[in-house]
Amino acid sequence: MNVRRAKTAGFCMGVSLALQKLNTALERRAGQSAGAGRICTLGPIIHNPQVLAEYETRGVVCVNDPAQLRQDDVAVIRAHGITRQVEQAVCASGATVVDATCPKVKKAQLSIARATSQGATLLLFGEEDHPEVRGLISYACGPAHVFGNAVELAALPLDPAQPYVLASQTTQDREIFTSIQESLSRALDDLTILSTICDATRERQEEARNIASSVDVMVVVGGRQSGNTRRLADVAALNGIATYHVESAEELEPKNFANKPRVGLTAGASTPKSLIDAAEKWLSSL
């Protein structure tokens, strides 16, 4: 089988930085005396089950409530960021805080705060229950609405005479956002547009589209909780070919690749190279 592997597959800059900060915290704690505080993350550091399981074996504790923190803990903020309110509670806990928020997400948070400082309504394109989106919304100084598609946007009671700010979750589909941007620009008199989709997301999606147009089937490797991985699968599937989103090579089935000699392989921004390598090896063996 001919496997075409995406060059952009695997860890993005934000994920690499977050894990580097977590590893540094673990190394420093290892050099301290017994009985030192815990290394904690505020929610999963990234959305990949294998990576999270590895850190759990190394003693990292995942907490979802700042009230669970102790003064001698090191609290590592997840790559997706957290809400302003949670961050304040973390700082008040007395724990040592390590901010591993992706720089692109942090920039989006601050851009939203500045753009809405006079009370403009935020329109955020994203997944309402995603931790990054909850964090972005918390930085809005005025009202805020989250929508996941054009239908949800059309249902919002927008007043053309009021000021609005349009932004996006950093891992959303760039083409869909551009279409939404053009539509709102025609409908609203006062619209500020923030470019918050990161370049890595755009490049991965463009490469996935390109590969999907020249193969018989696509495989996307990554955690099912990973929004950017799910969107890569969606982008590939739009080309009309079978697309399989798996967390590891163990989920691949030979029957899905029968009479399909060309396969495309990509992976989410939180997928380790080892998992991509394993999937490529499995596919190449067919």
From Swiss-Prot:
(2E)-4-hydroxy-3-methylbut-2-enyl diphosphate binds at H47, H80, H130, T170, S226, N228, S270. Binds 1 [4Fe-4S] cluster per subunit. It catalyses: isopentenyl diphosphate + 2 oxidized [2Fe-2S]-[ferredoxin] + H2O = (2E)-4-hydroxy-3-methylbut-2-enyl diphosphate + 2 reduced [2Fe-2S]-[ferredoxin] + 2 H(+); dimethylallyl diphosphate + 2 oxidized [2Fe-2S]-[ferredoxin] + H2O = (2E)-4-hydroxy-3-methylbut-2-enyl diphosphate + 2 reduced [2Fe-2S]-[ferredoxin] + 2 H(+). InterPro entries: LytB/IspH. [4Fe-4S] cluster binds at C12, C102, C198. Its EC number is 1.17.7.4. Pfam families: LYTB. Pathway: Isoprenoid biosynthesis; dimethylallyl diphosphate biosynthesis; dimethylallyl diphosphate from (2E)-4-hydroxy-3-methylbutenyl diphosphate: step 1/1; Isoprenoid biosynthesis; isopentenyl diphosphate biosynthesis via DXP pathway; isopentenyl diphosphate from 1-deoxy-D-xylulose 5-phosphate: step 6/6. One of its GO terms (molecular function) is 4-hydroxy-3-methylbut-2-enyl diphosphate reductase activity. It is an enzyme of class 1 (oxidoreductase). One of its GO terms (biological process) is terpenoid biosynthetic process. Isopentenyl diphosphate binds at H47, H80, H130, S226, N228, S270. It comes from the Bacteria. Belongs to the IspH family. HAMAP family: IspH. Catalyzes the conversion of 1-hydroxy-2-methyl-2-(E)-butenyl 4-diphosphate (HMBPP) into a mixture of isopentenyl diphosphate (IPP) and dimethylallyl diphosphate (DMAPP). Acts in the terminal step of the DOXP/MEP pathway for isoprenoid precursor biosynthesis. NCBIfam families: ispH_lytB. This is 4-hydroxy-3-methylbut-2-enyl diphosphate reductase. The lineage of its organism: Bacteria, Pseudomonadati, Thermodesulfobacteriota, Desulfovibrionia, Desulfovibrionales.
